[in-house]
């Protein structure tokens, strides 16, 4: 029974590499949105606060401050609605979860930029 579930989950995984980012990176996620009969692409840019789960159920949480208000949005990483993920800036952090960014605005909500080679956690 367990092998059958694993096989079904592996079929749902996306083959292209969308996981070349870590917690602390600023990324831009493009998703497909259906408005009435039209289909368009919407982007959301934010700092990766957490990566949870694994396999087909892996979830990323992004945080961004817009117009003085903090916003948090979660995405299923292997969802067919995700068109693409682009890394805008690499961040240098010492934590696996950045929930302390939730109440911060301005300079306090910034993550130091990392310059240099880095391999993503898989």
From Swiss-Prot:
The keyword DNA-binding does not apply. GO terms for biological process: translation. One of its GO terms (molecular function) is structural constituent of ribosome. It comes from Chlamydia abortus (strain DSM 27085 / S26/3). Keywords: Ribonucleoprotein, Ribosomal protein. This protein is located at the 30S-50S ribosomal subunit interface and may play a role in the structure and function of the aminoacyl-tRNA binding site. GO terms for cellular component: cytosolic large ribosomal subunit. Belongs to the bacterial ribosomal protein bL19 family. It holds the Pfam family Ribosomal_L19. This is Large ribosomal subunit protein bL19.
């Amino acid at each position: 029974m367990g092998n059958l579930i694993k096989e079904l989950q592996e079929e749902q995984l996306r083959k292209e590499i969308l996981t070349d980012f870590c917690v602390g990176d600023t990324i831009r996620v493009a998703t497909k949105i259906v408005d009435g009969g039209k289909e368009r692409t919407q982007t959301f840019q934010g700092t990766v606060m957490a990566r949870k789960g694994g396999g087909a159920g892996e979830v990323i949480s992004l945080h961004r401050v817009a117009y003085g208000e903090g916003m948090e949005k979660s995405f299923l990483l292997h969802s067919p609605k995700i068109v693409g993920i682009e890394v805008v800036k690499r961040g240098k952090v010492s934590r696996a979860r950045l929930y302390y960014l939730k109440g911060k605005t301005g300079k306090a909500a910034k993550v130091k930029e990392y310059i240099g080679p880095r391999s993503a956690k898989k």
